[in-house]
């Protein structure tokens, strides 16, 4: 029930004119002409429509195939939608980082779980691109120039936030000063896992000083004091429930991230084989090497120690 004096809650732009629980009232013949189809609002000359709310015009006008090939539209939309999902993943990860710094773990759990679900969407998206055959891709590949997913600055920020730091990966963005500066700040900041390790220290676990004061521009490396802390958490989960849940959220996240990488490799092998990538990398062999990267090493190693 609405408290007296409170304004009515704003209506979801996707909902109809009536509340979801409003009873259906059959309309008299001829009512549709004036009341709208099933009483839905049909005139948006003075109000915001679905397309207005979502800014659909610029989004749907952002696909500009460079080749005459029919399949290029699939290629463009696959990558554009992936960038949108990455935008959401980054949005949630930044919020999770802030929550962890503030010791507000339940909201961080929700955000990290959402990122894992976003990664599942990205995994499934490869199934759509995999409908493109090698001959179809070969017809449009010359029009791509040197552009490559390797140059995705959102993907690079995602890698940096998850702890896979590499200063050389700033170079493809030197021609975009604002993006370069943003990525450099992310490179130099503590990663998600760095903040979780700081959390372990705040909760009383003896983390080595050199780990807490690490060079944030370097990739995550295994630390025995961090593994000892996680071992204590896993041996007595009820005594450290929030940290135990955090550990499992991180494992879920890396699991989903690995699946995304693996699906990327297999899709590339299926479509282009072992040709060099458009961005100059070795293509599939480079992507296979990336499968060996471990983001949260102690959380995986502790499973053997238990």
Swiss-Prot record:
Its cofactor is heme. The keyword Metal-binding applies. GO terms for biological process: L-tryptophan catabolic process to acetyl-CoA; L-tryptophan catabolic process to kynurenine. InterPro entries: Trp/Indoleamine_2_3_dOase-like, Trp_2-3-dOase_bac, Trp_2_3_dOase. It is an enzyme of class 1 (oxidoreductase). SUPFAM superfamilies: Indolic compounds 2,3-dioxygenase-like. Pathway: Amino-acid degradation; L-tryptophan degradation via kynurenine pathway; L-kynurenine from L-tryptophan: step 1/2. GO terms for molecular function: heme binding; metal ion binding; tryptophan 2,3-dioxygenase activity. It catalyses: L-tryptophan + O2 = N-formyl-L-kynurenine. Binds 1 heme group per subunit. Residues 1-33 are annotated as: Disordered. Keywords: Dioxygenase, Heme, Iron, Metal-binding, Oxidoreductase, Tryptophan catabolism. The keyword Transmembrane helix does not apply. HAMAP family: T23O. Belongs to the tryptophan 2,3-dioxygenase family. This is Tryptophan 2,3-dioxygenase.
């Amino acid at each position: 029930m609405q408290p007296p004096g409170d304004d009515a809650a704003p209506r979801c732009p996707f909902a109809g004119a009536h509340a979801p629980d409003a009873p259906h009232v059959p309309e008299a013949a001829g009512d549709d002409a004036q009341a709208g189809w099933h009483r839905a609002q049909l005139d948006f000359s003075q109000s915001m429509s679905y397309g207005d709310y979502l800014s659909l015009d610029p989004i749907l006008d952002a696909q500009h195939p460079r080749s005459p090939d029919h399949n290029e539209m699939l290629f463009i939309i696959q990558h554009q939608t992936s960038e949108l999902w990455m935008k959401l993943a980054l949005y949630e990860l930044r919020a999770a980082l802030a929550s962890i710094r503030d010791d507000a773990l339940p909201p961080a759990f929700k955000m990290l779980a959402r990122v894992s679900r976003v990664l599942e969407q990205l995994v499934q998206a490869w199934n759509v691109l995999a409908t493109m055959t090698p001959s179809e891709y070969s017809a449009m590949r010359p029009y791509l120039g040197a552009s490559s997913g390797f140059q995705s600055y959102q993907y690079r920020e995602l890698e940096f936030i998850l702890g896979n730091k590499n200063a050389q990966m700033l170079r493809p963005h030197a021609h975009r000063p604002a993006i370069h500066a943003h990525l450099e700040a992310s490179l130099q900041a503590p990663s998600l896992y760095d903040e979780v390790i700081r959390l372990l220290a705040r909760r009383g676990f003896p983390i080595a000083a050199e780990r807490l004061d690490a060079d944030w521009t370097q990739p995550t490396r295994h630390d025995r004091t961090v593994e000892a802390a996680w071992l204590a958490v896993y041996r007595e989960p009820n005594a450290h429930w929030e940290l135990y849940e955090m550990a499992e959220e991180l494992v879920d996240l890396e699991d989903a991230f690995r699946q995304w990488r693996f699906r990327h490799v297999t899709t590339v092998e299926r479509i282009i084989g072992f040709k060099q990538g458009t961005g100059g990398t070795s293509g599939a062999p480079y992507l296979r090497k990336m499968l060996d990267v471990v983001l949260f090493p102690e959380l995986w190693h502790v499973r053997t120690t238990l």
